């Protein structure tokens, strides 16, 4: 009996050691976040083991674990019709809310899920619940795009998928089929999905027939640049779940089919050092010393290497492509973008990407709403149901849907 108690105490201590990580005092539901982070880290470690044994790619294994516990079939309710179909060969899940009696034509949001271009699905419960709620509360048609993921495809194929599906949906006969008002269609996404939504919005500015097709864009803690991994938020939240800095850098390398040997060099900005001439013209477009307010910059200092590793950009030129990093787009591209909503979270390495993009868009004359949550963390908006229900998740979701309701 005594030995059993000792063993139990040891196991509990070990579990507590694995679960506990230091967190900012202001973050929402810290112990729940620790448990969520421990679960995700455990899944990552299992997938890495599977990869090291040569059984499968670690991202395929990790995504299998993630989607196995939450993927669900298209299930309609009295208020929302849900169907799986494809738009020009791209899988989508369509959520049709009931039209308002006084408005026979409905609004619509094209939604792109997050997951580092490699994980998650439009069909997992988190996104299914979010889009169902949006369709019901907005009386709208929500098109959730099931774009292809790394390692099946790499940049820019994910962008091609969302553009193809969106162009198909915007055809007059398709909008008519779903009873959607062509003047009230928006694009939205979270995290990597926010990146793809921003890229799509910019790509549409190059095509005259598509230039004014989208009424708005709503970007939720979007990832927008891969040039500077030492913005104040990257420095402040480098170890904060669920997106530590080294994980974000690896997602970028996965997206570009790059070499993990570059991770440490990129973390200290060796890929965009002063001797990398190809990056020189782009630095001013994300100069956080001028784009961020003093309350955000605090006492953080820029990390700018005099000499670095020019080989990184030579091997991965996509790092400097605005299609991958919408924050570095030219001014005239930004000027053509529609009304924009950007949601940022204080405890997120991507916080400053969103704030800088809002500033650049504002300077370009775009109507921008920046919605910042002091207790938010990356990914929080989809965590609204037990056992992963966070107070900030519910508040961010409600604020996001309220803005869409008022502006779409």
Swiss-Prot record:
Glycans are attached at residues 270, 367, 389. Its EC number is 3.1.1.-, 3.1.1.71. It comes from the Eukaryota. A motif (Involved in the stabilization of the negatively charged intermediate by the formation of the oxyanion hole) lies at residues 113-115. Residues 26-408 are lumenal. Hydrolyzes 2-acetyl monoalkylglycerol ether (1-O-alkyl-2-acetyl-sn-glycerol), the penultimate precursor of the pathway for de novo synthesis of platelet-activating factor. May be responsible for the hydrolysis of cholesterol esters (such as cholesteryl (9Z-octadecenoate)) in macrophages. Also involved in organ detoxification by hydrolyzing exogenous organophosphorus compounds. It is an enzyme of class 3 (hydrolase). GO terms for molecular function: acetylalkylglycerol acetylhydrolase activity; phosphate ion binding; serine hydrolase activity. The lineage of its organism: Eukaryota, Metazoa, Chordata, Craniata, Vertebrata. It catalyses: a 1-O-alkyl-2-acetyl-sn-glycerol + H2O = a 1-O-alkyl-sn-glycerol + acetate + H(+); 1-O-hexadecyl-2-acetyl-sn-glycerol + H2O = 1-O-hexadecyl-sn-glycerol + acetate + H(+); a cholesterol ester + H2O = cholesterol + a fatty acid + H(+); cholesteryl (9Z-octadecenoate) + H2O = cholesterol + (9Z)-octadecenoate + H(+). GO terms for cellular component: endoplasmic reticulum; membrane; plasma membrane. Present in brain, heart, kidney, lung, spinal cord and testis but not liver (at protein level). Expressed in peritoneal macrophages and kidney. The gene is Nceh1. Keywords: Cell membrane, Endoplasmic reticulum, Glycoprotein, Hydrolase, Lipid degradation, Lipid metabolism, Membrane, Microsome, Signal-anchor, Transmembrane, Transmembrane helix. Disruption phenotype: Mice are phenotypically normal but more sensitive to organophosphorus insecticide toxicity. The chain crosses the membrane at residues 5-25. N-glycosylated. This is Neutral cholesterol ester hydrolase 1.
